[in-house]
Amino acid sequence: MSYYRPPGVYPEKLPTAGLVSLWQGARIPVIIGRGQRTIEETDVITSHSLGGTDQLPEAAASIVRVGDYYDQVKYVETTDFLFTGTINSPSRNIDWSPSGSEPASGATYYVTYRKPVPSDQYDYHMYTDENEIIRVHGAESTTNLVTVGAVIALRQGCPAVGIIQINLDDTGAYPSGGPSNPTDADYYVAFTRALDILEQLDTDQCRILVPMTTLDSQTYPILSDYLDHAYTMSLTSQRRWRTLIRGRAATASASNSTVRDAFSALAQSYRSHTAARRMIVVAPGEVSRVIRDETTGVASSVTFDGSVLAAAAAGRICAYHNPAVPITMKDFTAFSANRVFSNADMNVMAGNGVSIFFYKGRTLKCRHGITCDLTNANTQEISVVEIEDYIKVQSIFVLENRYIGSLFTDEIIASIQASVIAFWDILIEQEVIDDYDQGSVSVTRNENDPRICNIFGRIKPMYPLNWIDIRFRFYAGETA
């Protein structure tokens, strides 16, 4: 039923537009994890009769408030009314039989309730506004980890963040536990289902994967499956280059030496994987963030596991237009690290391929951003791997629409070579690469298949400056 409202100004924040405009080459981290299962809805209800029953127009899980205005709490559940019917069904009712306070017969009142999220809640979504993330996926909490990770990533400066909220509500599909008390088996099924969505995303929608979990057992190898996914998608045939970042479970009671050895062993375990350069392990395993309770308004520090640190690293990597910019010695904000390692412990972990976050003064920084592949600078440095993938992605953008489907003439070969050289010159200007060997650039027709154009060239990426060695000698007297 419609209702009257007096003339006036009623401010309301609108949701962020669904279409997100990003620059060509923007890199997007995707956060995968648990979020809210219900959302708030407010309806205007007309009271049928005193002591009677009024049906809600939609399925509802619980009542938030009932009042004469949309933001008022006036009528109290069990004292003034009962909430009856089958949970999450369209036959939920406000039953005024307790004979407490109630609206007059024929009067309108407002019911705010929580209803199950729509089915598209579990699809891929991209956001640039953390308030919109909270509205859709729920407030930050230990159960809404997808919100925590996405907000942290945006706070580090990434242009946008992708979210896939795992679906734990389809209880018939899970071995045990269900949505209220999910087990490792339930999480494994839910995270595995999310891989089906990730396989449909292109590189401009998904660059870095951050599953908000540390579960990776032999029985439930969530993170191992995600690394295999990153490897498969990064094959030349798939053309969707990806990296996985993970943390470890929070172990606040463990000693530094125990945690050091665990991180070292974890990074070493990825060393032999074909996609080791696409695996980033971040330490420490516990971080804290101050979160305000939406109901009480009280702010408190909450401890999270290393997946939150992984989300922060992903957000910082994707924050720069230039993929050559490393996260080494960059500042991180919006959370704090709970564990402080000695330099000796950090050296041991870094020597095994762990990216460590530490305090320099009062500022949290990444000590050295590295992958688990220590073969050489081209595989160890996160920024160099990012350059590699950036060149691949931009090569498609530069060449595919312009040349694929053209007649394969000598003029086309010359034009392709000119485009490649111009593209690489731009990369030098943008400081993505340091140089390339122009004499090595060749564009030829494949000898075995006349439809294939082969391009080859030698490129020198822009390496990060990590060490400065200073040597000097003292001398006595006026001259050396």
Per-range role (PLM):
Residues M1-A480:
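Surface-exposed assembly/interface segments
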